[in-house]
Curated annotation (Swiss-Prot):
Function, as annotated: One of the primary rRNA binding proteins. Required for association of the 30S and 50S subunits to form the 70S ribosome, for tRNA binding and peptide bond formation. It has been suggested to have peptidyltransferase activity; this is somewhat controversial. Makes several contacts with the 16S rRNA in the 70S ribosome.
GO terms assigned for molecular function: rRNA binding; structural constituent of ribosome; transferase activity
Gene3D superfamilies documented for this protein: 2.30.30.30, Nucleic acid-binding proteins (2.40.50.140), Ribosomal protein L2, domain 3 (4.10.950.10)
Species: Oenococcus oeni (strain ATCC BAA-331 / PSU-1)
HAMAP family documented for this protein: Ribosomal_uL2_B
Protein name (Swiss-Prot/TrEMBL): Large ribosomal subunit protein uL2
A GO biological process held by the record: cytoplasmic translation
Amino acid sequence: MAIKTYKPTTNGRRNMSGFDFSVITKTTPEKSLLAKKSKTGARNAEGRMTVRHHGGGHKQQYRIIDFKRIKDDKTATVKAIEYDPNRTANIALLVYEDGVKSYILAPKGLEAGTKVQSGPDADIKVGNALPLGNIPEGTLIHNIELKPGKGGQLARSAGTSAQILGKDDAGKYVIIRLSSGEVRMIPATSRATIGEVGNAEHSLISWGKAGRSRWRGKTPHVRGSVMNPNDHPHGGGEGKAPVGHPSPMSPWGKKSYGKKTRDKKKPSTKFIVRGRKGK
């Protein structure tokens, strides 16, 4: 979507930008593809906070997205491009030949009226879903399955994609490069969708004021250096005191910069050919 700017009529409006929603063709969601979405305030069943800086936000309904794309040999028509408040990407409403409706992530260039397919014999064109082993090298893909039949898990945010680099000698795995720079092997029978996720301009939005972040369910991110010493390792001292430790610390007293957090014994590590950039 294109970016629109606002006149500086107030301090909050100054430097604010937003979407013009020019690519959105339908403003009301498909009722049969909606689900209830309850807010937890980032608290678990015991009432304890499990994630910081989450809470509040506008009420939303969840759009049920088809991440698996297993309805083979049925051509679907893109009925509309819709806004989804639950993600950065837009979504596309599909209507299959037999009347079944579903939502998919809207890739770049997909328009209302386009025909899309899924399955091993589908054409290599934007919006079609195929097994990775059937997609040629160099193709940009998104909504990538880590395990066959589990549904897409990688490259789902606005503007993201991965690229197919090749296959292993046995043909069991396909080598892809993710947007992070990581190169990894994925089973050739796992599915992915052709193209890159649309709405790449999302990263250019200037939210402008704190209230817009609160509407999105984000609460203030307080610096540890302005807390009391019993609340954070950086807290206390007179004025703008230094950290007081050999390296910056998390609120729980662990090193927060540069420490690797991935489990060394994680089974999927063997599928990573090269780590992320700078790692």
